[in-house]
From Swiss-Prot:
Comp. bias intervals (Basic residues): 117-132
GO molecular function terms noted in the UniProt entry: rRNA binding; structural constituent of ribosome; tRNA binding
Subunit structure: Part of the 30S ribosomal subunit. Contacts proteins S8 and S17. May interact with IF1 in the 30S initiation complex.
SUPFAM superfamilies, sorted: Nucleic acid-binding proteins
Species per Swiss-Prot/TrEMBL record: Sorangium cellulosum (strain So ce56) (Polyangium cellulosum (strain So ce56))
Family: Belongs to the universal ribosomal protein uS12 family.
Protein name, per record: Small ribosomal subunit protein uS12
Lineage: Bacteria, Pseudomonadati, Myxococcota, Polyangia, Polyangiales
Gene name linked to the record: rpsL
């Protein structure tokens, strides 16, 4: 425990802030190229095949990114836009692909409906407004 005179001379070191998405380097999004597109299984209580891709960003960093929505058209060498935001049940996945930009098409929507269009939360999945 320092004395008051020691604190006056030296001061305390400010706590360093640790960013949740370091590969973005203080940018809202980054462009990258898919190196590998694959599926992974989530952590213990959940069970699924989550669609993810390994992306080499424009700043030469390589990150794992989640592909949201139902169905996608991404493959190796697809150019994608990456935003921050982790997936809680996939360890090491701290980024999301932005749907509806660059090579990532908008999501098709829930397959349970007979017409495969997404009418709600469209902006999250890059889906255009339906005609009527």
């Amino acid at each position: 425990m320092p004395t008051i005179s020691q604190l006056i001379r030296q001061g305390r070191e400010a706590a360093r802030y640790k960013t949740a998405s370091p590969a973005l380097k203080s940018c809202p999004q980054r462009r990258g190229v898919c190196v590998r597109v694959y599926t992974t299984t989530p952590k213990k209580p959940n069970s699924a095949l989550r669609k993810v891709c390994r992306v080499r960003l424009s700043n030469q960093m390589e990150v794992t990114s989640y592909i949201p929505g139902e169905g996608h058209n991404l493959q190796e060498h697809s150019v994608v836009l990456i935003r921050g935001g982790r997936v809680k049940d996939l360890p090491g996945v701290r980024y999301h692909v932005v749907r509806g930009t660059l090579d990532a098409s908008g999501a098709a929507g829930p397959s349970s409906t007979n017409k495969a269009t997404r009418n709600r939360k469209r902006s999250k999945y890059g889906v255009k407004r339906p005609k009527a």
